[in-house]
Amino acid sequence: MDSHTSTEGVPLSETNNRSHATPSAQYCQMTVEETCSKLQTNPETGLTSSQEAMHRRDIHGSNEFAQEEEDSLIKKFFEQFSENPLLLLLIGAAAVSFFMGNHDDAISITLAILIVTTVGFVQEYRSEKSLEALNKLVPPEAHLIRAGNSQTVLASTLVPGDLVEFSVGDRIPADCRIVKAVHLSIDESNLTGETTPVTKDTNPVTGTPPIGLADRTNTAYMGTLVRDGNGTGIVVGTGSHTAFGAVYDMVSEISTPKTPLQASMDNLGKDLSLVSFGVIGVICLIGMFQGRDWLEMFTIGVSLAVAAIPEGLPIIVTVTLALGVLRMSRQKAIVRKLPSVETLGSVNVICSDKTGTLTRNHMSCTTCWTVDMGDLANAVTLKPGQSHTEADPKAVAALKNSVSLANMLKVGNLCNNSKFNREAGHLVGNATDIALIEVLDYFGLEDTRETRKRVAEVPFSSSRKWMLTSTTTGDSSTPMISVKGAGEVIAPFCEYYCKKDGKTAPFNDDMRKKVTEIASEMSNDGLRIIAFAYKQGKYEEGSEEAPEGLVFAGLMGLYDPPRPDVPRAIRRLTTGGVRVVMITGDSAATALSIGRRIGMPLMPGTQSVVEGSKLATMSDQALDECLQTASIFARTSPEDKMKIVKGFQRRGDVVAMTGDGVNDAPALKLADIGIAMGQGGTDVAKEAADMILTDDDFATILSAIEEGKGIFNNIRNFITFQLSTSMAALSIVAVATIMGLENPLNPMQILWINILMDGPPAQSLGVEPVDPDVMNKPPRPRNEKVMTPDLVKKCVEAAVIILVGTMLVYVTQMQDGVIDKRDTTMTFTCFVFYDMFNALACRSATKSVFEIGFFSNKMFLYACGASIIGQLAVVYVPFLQSVFQTEALSVKDLLSLVLISSSVWILDEAKKYFLKSRSTNNYTNSVV
């Protein structure tokens, strides 16, 4: 990327010029003390009260950008006319009718125009509101310290003077003057265009003002990402008074591309429009050659165009997708991008993290082992969730008699970044860190971190696989270096081990071998292994290397139980042709143990488990062969995850990938569906993802895939309904015109049919409940078109039935040779009833209404009920009779029409029964 251009396409020079007036330009040249003094805050405890924060918010406003004013409802309503030229033609037809003295026709057409535009306006308004609701589902959050208490708040509530914390993967919530930085580096590429993370410190910036954005090394900008380390900062600018706010107006107009499905609907609409215009043109020409009134033919032609051209398809698709996404959100799955809904139904491989997704992400220490204990059978064992008052007496005795065990617990305590949240009433932080604090209660020990000062830290990373802290009691005593990490990484750093009496002895190769054996045994039981080491002495600040001469303290086995719904979810996914692959940083033995517990399909006699070290050396061909059988990938790195996803995609698979850390972001973005964790996920993972699980539960993915498949089926169902109705309406007028008959439907009736076709019945098909058997069918091919030959065939079949039945009624009603209002009313009502029964048949492409249940879709019942009531009103209400040129029908007439129009549903039910019976017979014959 060009270093002189930001990722949004804003020239860096212009970004700098606009940002010179922001508060960070002044505060970056002040010391921490000067900044805190000016903002009347504390660098360790933040603002003193919420009342003070509220007062500052009244002065500075919320920490958010001003939104553009929405167009008024009146403006949106009248935009319907400019967006649909056919409506303008209808207005012209109404005007011509009025000036020629046909006032009834003019009034009728005008009312129809108002009804059509109102329906379109309501649909579009509903779509926009649904999408607005989606955008509000993932509010940005900030980690705030106020009055010394840590809490998570909405970033929009921050004010200047607030103290915020940030660590790897977090997005900076406001412009901050950094007051603490531990190996802190921040990715500012989305602001400055520089892709290399910037190392941050707390020192004031020197130089002649104005100081450029890239030179403010003590400032963390809103919207930038923490790539390494952690820190705290005082908020100095919020909302429009941030560097991002200065250029917000230049990047706020971002057009949202249409989803592939919406694009295909647009193309389908254009194709159908061309066909419809062709048919309508032929109808009008034939009518004029037959000597019919040109105004009548023009009005009918335009009305047919309005009814036959499915201009409402893209809107209904959007509404259906949006409502489906909102339903997913109630099931704890937040879809950030609408195209993801379409892709969900095609997913056939899920690459899932183990921790927190397949398991509960609540670690408990179950095993403590030190070198002097010898075999694993002598290790201290604990029951998850057990407090120290109920601990095994042997465990308490072991602590009293073993300094090495006490030292191991101490290292786990000091090398720890979890914190107690007073408001929530529990510890927050990394699951492993929380377990290492909770285990202290088992032995009646206290958290001693408040009595010691941390003077150095090397944060854990997936590449290092270890973490280090250096702490001191604050006096002249020698600092203590505490290290924890993977056993195979920590053991080589150690030169000594701690004996039972607290003395140290050389840590030789035999002991290293013993540690490896014990770790392997613990891994086979499904435990995560953490090794601990320590050393008395100073650690050089800024160093990234592990110190020499460490003392090995011991091993702990942590257990993270599987989530209860995961085995069922895996079975359901496997049945539906979706393969589940576990990707974890744990050892192969631990991963295999968990995989068996959750019921992963592990193929006997094949290489089901592959370690990251082997993966790194595999060629593409070897990887392709490996992916055919491997179900578990252990000890993986972020690069390994990328390689796995690319490998599956190379095979033609549609891949969903779960992740929560900043190192998962590349794989999340590469996958066809990136799924981030809502509770434990970092901001960068959430931003890279297409979907967020608010409960971090793997079973939620099953619900999302089911919903995705169901939504696509529903879209096909209402397309079937709309197209078959359009084809029938065109065919009826075309056949009548060719046969030299008067048109059976007048313009008002045609427009009424259009309202029913694009209105409630069609939309209610979009919210049909998901078929329980949807996971018994394989995933939909990625490039499968919406319009399949079977769908077109069904549309034609339904249209032919409606055409034949409606024309039969029309012809039989005019046996006297005169066409009156009763004849057209019977024909019109017959077509509308056909419409309702056709909608009933379209509720499922394969199942009978008796299987899915008459009352399972209440929205459908309400929609059809309202449509039928509307039709009866058109037939029986005097005012509407004059508008639609109808007359009252007898009960006998209505019953006969119901009997005739139900044929489209009855024949569809018979076809479904026949196909199902044939499928059953074919299976029976194949197994007999």
Curated annotation (Swiss-Prot):
SUPFAM superfamilies reported for this sequence: Calcium ATPase, transduction domain A, Calcium ATPase, transmembrane domain M, HAD-like, Metal cation-transporting ATPase, ATP-binding domain N
Keywords per UniProt: ATP-binding, Calcium, Calcium transport, Golgi apparatus, Ion transport, Magnesium, Membrane, Nucleotide-binding, Phosphoprotein, Translocase, Transmembrane, Transmembrane helix, Transport
Cell location: Golgi apparatus membrane
Top-level taxonomic group: Eukaryota
One GO cellular component term noted in the UniProt record for this chain: endoplasmic reticulum
Region spans: Disordered: 1-25
GO BP field: calcium ion transmembrane transport; intracellular calcium ion homeostasis; intracellular manganese ion homeostasis; macroautophagy; manganese ion transport
InterPro entries linked: ATPase_P-typ_cation-transptr_C, ATPase_P-typ_cation-transptr_N, ATPase_P-typ_cyto_dom_N, ATPase_P-typ_P_site, ATPase_P-typ_TM_dom_sf, ATPase_P-typ_transduc_dom_A_sf, HAD-like_sf, HAD_sf
Protein's UniProt keywords contain DNA repair: no
Function recorded in the entry: This magnesium-dependent enzyme catalyzes the hydrolysis of ATP coupled with the transport of calcium. Has a role in the secretory pathway.
Protein name per the record: Calcium-transporting ATPase 1
